[in-house]
A protein has these predicted regions:
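Terminal catalytic/cofactor-binding subdomain
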Residues: 1-153, 160-161, 167, 187-202, ...
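Short, structured patches in soluble enzyme cores that scaffold and shape functional sites
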Residues: 154, 175-177, 220-222, 260-262
Length: 550
């Protein structure tokens, strides 16, 4: 086959971003905070949000954009949510996402420190505009909801596959794709991929019932999905959300909004999930590459999604078109296409990150096929939990590698005798954002993880390194990555420079529009940027240069 035109190699990198909703847990009540009780505690989060690195001149009525180009806000269900800035690689997105997690950790510590010392909030927030919030905060500190703990997971403790009222919060992925790509093609190619991606992208979740005892699901979000595609997010949840808010020139770009994914604790799992998705989207964007391939969807895709989720043997059979597959074999089908596209036909340039992602994807599927749980445990959350829980129950002779539906009557009886509450506590504490209490963080420091990481790195040397350094997080905390986040950062610099000369009445920041008003009686000056790769626009540059050099 002839190589494609060379201009295929000049395509801009895909814009990738994530939105992570965090869960608030009442230490006093020992339960997740109920959104219905939100009015009792939500006023305190004006103070909670003030701990994030955001422009001070925009307080208190502010949309939550940060110095690093990301955004923090209170979302549906009163979950604090962090959105990364527009990133140009999966690795960058993971680093900026992790910076947001550490911001949440800092905010939790500050909020609970204020509970112990009520003067702290008054000292920290000296702006008179916050008097009312401080008073409300102090008044409610002794209420039943504090101390608050923050978790990075997606399900309440009470949610089971049979629960009629699902309670879940999301981790959402965003990918830029050309608007010329039809949704029907995206659905056809991507839905089977998303159904099986939970093999390595799931964060695991322990469930139980009174017949078979506890069992481990590969992922959390599949338990609450109802549709393959729709415009909803909180009811009748789809894998792909079709409500198109491109935050860009809509005639050129679509923002593909994926809500099936889990909020991983492992940056390696998160990276593989984002990178593999972006690589498969590269195939979708190519007009000719997938021509002639059969992507006929499996029967009952949502049922299949949940069946795979509950199968820790990774062997659930299903048809895609005429071919019989398992989740592993279907992921290999996509991986083979990506390898041919990048490494054989060289239709686009394979950067080092892309080559690493392809190699890791293949090595992970190889290990899953061998059922090498320990090797994957340092890198994938669901395998870490499988390893942890099997270690705890090893004296019983049982294993969570056997799904509940395959257990004998004697095995079911033994599983029912396992102290579920102890296991479930570890399951939940795996997702603590406070690192000194996080089971994930503690597990990463075990000898097993060190040994298996060393073993895996003999095949893939880049796995010997930590995914990110302290310097990476420090940069991602304060500075935007390449792209439009730097344009918003330049606007903040402009507004703060003016504010040092004369107080600014108000500013407003959104993804593609910034608003500036010097005095109350003035009209707004608007700055617009519909290009997520663009770091500066001419109108903002002229304003910024004027104040920089005046």
């Amino acid at each position: 086959m002839a190589k494609p035109p060379s201009d295929r190699k000049d395509i801009k990198p895909r814009i990738i971003g994530t939105e992570t909703e965090y869960a608030l847990f009442s230490g006093m009540q020992n339960m997740f905070l109920d959104p219905k009780a939100a009015p009792t505690y939500i006023s305190n989060f004006h103070i909670f949000l003030e701990t994030f690195p955001r422009p001070s001149l925009a307080r208190p009525n502010y949309t939550g954009f940060l110095y690093n180009g990301g955004r923090v806000y209170i979302d549906t269900g009163f979950h604090p949510e962090y959105a990364t800035p527009e990133c140009q690689s999966a690795r960058t997105a993971v680093i900026y996402e992790r910076a947001g997690q550490y911001m949440m950790e800092q905010a939790e510590e500050f909020l609970n420190a204020c509970m112990r010392n009520q003067d702290l909030a008054r000292e920290y927030l000296s702006d008179p505009a916050f008097d009312a919030y401080r008073d409300a905060f102090a008044e409610k500190l002794n209420k039943k909801y504090f101390p608050v703990r923050i978790f990075r997971n997606n399900m309440t403790l009470e949610t089971l596959p049979t629960t009629p009222d699902y309670v879940s919060w999301g981790f959402h992925e965003n990918y830029s794709i050309p608007s010329r790509i039809e949704l029907a093609k995206i659905e056809k190619v991507m839905i089977p991929f998303f159904i099986t991606r939970q093999l390595y992208g799931g964060s695991g979740w322990l469930i139980t019932n009174n017949k078979t005892g506890p069992s481990l699901c590969l992922a959390q979000r599949p338990l609450v999905m109802q549709l393959t595609m729709s415009s909803g997010t909180t009811s009748n949840r789809p894998l792909i959300n079709t409500r198109d808010e491109p935050h860009a020139a809509g005639d050129l770009l679509r923002r593909l909004h994926i809500i099936i994914g889990d909020a991983n604790m492992s940056p390696w799992a998160q990276w593989l999930k984002l990178a593999a998705t972006s690589l498969v989207l590269d195939l979708v964007e190519d007009e000719m590459f997938l021509e002639g391939l059969d992507f006929s969807p499996p029967n009952n895709p949502i049922t299949l999604l949940r069946d795979i989720c509950k199968d820790t043997t990774f062997s659930t059979p299903f048809f895609m078109g005429p071919k019989l597959h398992t989740a592993v074999s279907l992921q290999r089908f996509y991986l083979d296409l990506v390898q041919r596209y990048y490494l054989v036909e060289e239709r686009r340039e394979a950067t080092q990150e892309i080559r690493n992602a392809i190699a890791f994807w293949q090595a992970v599927l190889d290990a899953i096929e061998r059922s090498d749980i320990a090797l994957l445990a340092p890198f994938l959350d669901n395998f870490a939990k499988l390893c942890l829980f099997d270690t705890i129950i090893q004296e019983t002779g049982l294993s969570f590698k056997k799904p509940a539906h395959d257990r004998s009557s004697s095995e079911r009886k033994k599983f029912l005798e396992i102290p579920f509450d102890r296991l479930k506590s570890l399951d939940l504490m795996y997702h603590r954002v406070l690192r000194r209490e996080s089971v994930y963080a503690k597990f990463q420091n075990t000898s097993l993880c060190r040994e298996e990481r060393k073993k895996f790195s003999t095949r893939l040397p880049f796995l010997a390194n930590e995914f990110f350094t302290d310097a990476d997080i420090e940069t991602a905390w304060w500075y935007p990555p390449e792209g439009r986040g730097r344009w918003r950062g330049a606007f903040i610099e402009f507004a703060e420079t003016i504010n040092r000369i004369e107080p600014v009445f108000s500013i407003g920041i959104d993804w593609s529009i910034c608003r500036f008003r010097q005095r109350e009686q003035d009209s707004d000056t608007l700055f617009k940027n519909d290009d997520p790769w663009c770091e500066m626009t001419a109108d903002l540059k002229s304003k910024l240069d004027a104040v920089r050099y005046s």
